[in-house]
Structure formats: C-alpha cells, structure tokens
Amino acid sequence: MSTPESEPQAAPPDTPSTEPVRDESRARLEEALVEIKRVIAGQDEMLERVLVCLVAGGHLLIEGVPGLAKTLTIKTTAAVLGGTFRRIQFTPDLVPSDLVGTRIYRPDEGGFETDLGPVFCNFLLADEINRAPAKVQSALLEVMQEHQVTIGHDTHVVPEPFLVMATQNPIESEGTYPLPEAQVDRFMLKILVGYPERDEELTVVSRSLGDPVGVRQILPLTELAELQRAGKSIYVDPGLVSYAVSLAAATREPGEFGLGEVSDLVAYGASPRGPIALVGSARALALIHGRDYVIPADIRALVKDAFRHRLVLTYQALAEERSADDVLDAVIAAVPQPRLELGRPAAA
C-alpha cells in the first residue's frame, strides 16, 4: 500500500477516489453543524475541531482572547446534541471540591449525602483554566482521563459523551498558573482562535440587534455514540501511521531530519500521545468529510493542533520569539509524506 518515506515523493492528490461515505448519522452531523452555524458566525475551524474531538472522544484546549464565542459554541453544541452543559470560571480561590463535588452531612437524616459537582455533564467549559492552582487543574484533568470521580469511598462515573473544552487567555499572564506539560498533554487538540473576518463580525453585530436565535436538537447523544464507534472503524493506511510517527520523531530529533536550525529551539518534542491524537483526530475528520479512510491532507490539517501544546521550547526560542507553530512548519516541510493508493482496501 505505501512506499518508503525515506525518499521525497510527489504529493498524492487529496481528492478521494471513491464515493463519499453517506450514512444517516453522518448526514445528521452535517445538519447539526448547520444548526450550530445559525448561532455562531464564522469560527469554522473551531466548530470543526469541536466536532472532531466529539467524534474522536478527546478534549479540546482553546487559546484566544475573550469575546470569540468560545462559551456560546459549546453551549450551542450541547443544545443541538441534547446534552447537558456546565461552565466553570476558574479562579485562584477554586478548590477541587468545587469541580468534582463533596460529601455533606445532613443532620436531619443523620448521615452524609454526596453533592456532585459541575463536572457531571456532557459538555464542560473550563474557562481560563490557567487561573486556578495546580491541584484544581489536576482534579479536572484526572476526570478527563478517567471519566470518573472518587468522593469519599464511592466512585461516580461522568455521563457519556464527556467533552471538556478548556480556554486560555494569551494576553493576561498575571495571576495565572501555567498548565504543566504532563497535564496539557491530556488534551487531544489545542487550537488558536483569532478575530473573525470583517464580514463575519458584521454578521455577529447584526444578529446581536435582534432576538436570540434558538436552536433545535438535531443529533441525539445515542447517534453521537454511533458516530464515535464509526470513527474507530475508519481505515488508516500503515504509511500514514508511519508518517504521523515520523512527524513526532522530527520534533524530538530534528537533526535526523535535516532540521539543524530547529534543534536549538526545542527542549522536548511531542510525546507518544501526539501521534496517537493525530491519527485518532484524522479518523474523525475523515468521517466528518464523508470518507471511510484517512488521506494525507487529514494528517497535515491536524499536525499543529495535535502537537503545538506538546512541544517544550527552549529559552533561545522564546528570546527569538519563535513559536511551536514555527517549529511545526519546518517539520511538516521536512518530513516527506508517503505516496498512497487512496481508498480502503477490499480486505480492510
């Protein structure tokens, strides 16, 4: 199926050679996206990445200034999918029990009762996650990984699906607690959200002059679970798996890929969770685009989102104002993509 990637080869076309996969659940997902866009103007990449994480079963970290529809996006998504939504504003005085819950003594009943916290929902917005101390961040990230919480001697499972969308403000750094590398690694993707285009902003302002737009429930959570199962059956050519691993390896050992200029910029490269997240999210993106197989364009489209928060840059990179995206641009250009026969093999 694949040719060795040691020699640069011509890029294969990104147009699939077979008819798009069309099933009822995926068509409903498209309908759900249209319904969400009735409320959210622009921010197409953020909306698509939210759906990618939903289908892939991962969590999303968003970096952007306030006012870019992050809260409205996940709240609207919850309404369209019929799930429960909670928002937690992270502050320095927050404690873990404010998130996960606690046991409360009831004198009238002569015993303790468990009061579950706001993490027990389908869609959780952790707003400005870097404003809470490390123990609170750890409590949330443990729930993200385990999908359960232990309070006292009892274990409580969060409802499925469970999506955490955490935000960070890139402007304000005073009074913040940066996420440790081992914890930020738990997020499947990290995206950078910028200001909308002028025509999109005009639409936003025009909509604000009228009544709030209501949305319908389009895709039940049961159908979302079917989509998640379908995402796991999307075919990934072994050559693309090797390509994802090579991209990660190039962030760790850039000299081996002819990236000597990058060696002084990266202290630690992407962990093995990087290519795992990249391949998993590429599967979800292929499903959203109507294919039952991954193409190289899916991988390339998600490399930065899957890797940027997993790189630890050197002081030299910071002094030169070089970003993780600068490093990844060089990596993408240096690592040759494999030539593939597009489509799912008959035996796959």
Predicted segments with their positions:
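Walker A/P-loop
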Residues: L54-T91
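Conserved C-terminal "switch" segment of AAA+ ATPases
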Residues: T18-R26, V39-I40, T176, K190-E261, ...
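C-terminal engagement/docking regions of AAA+ P-loop ATPases
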Residues: S2-T15, E19-R22, E256-A348
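Walker B catalytic acidic pair
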Residues: G64, D127-E128, A139
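Pre-Walker A (pre-P-loop) alpha-helix and adjacent loop at the N terminus of AAA/AAA+ ATPase modules
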Residues: R22-L68
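Conserved alpha-helical scaffold flanking the Walker A/P-loop in AAA+ ATPase domains
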Residues: R49-V52, Y105-L125, D154
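P-loop (Walker A) phosphate-binding loop of NTP-binding proteins
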Residues: V65, L99, T167
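Canonical AAA+ ATPase core
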Residues: R106-G111, E128, A132-V136, M144-I234, ...
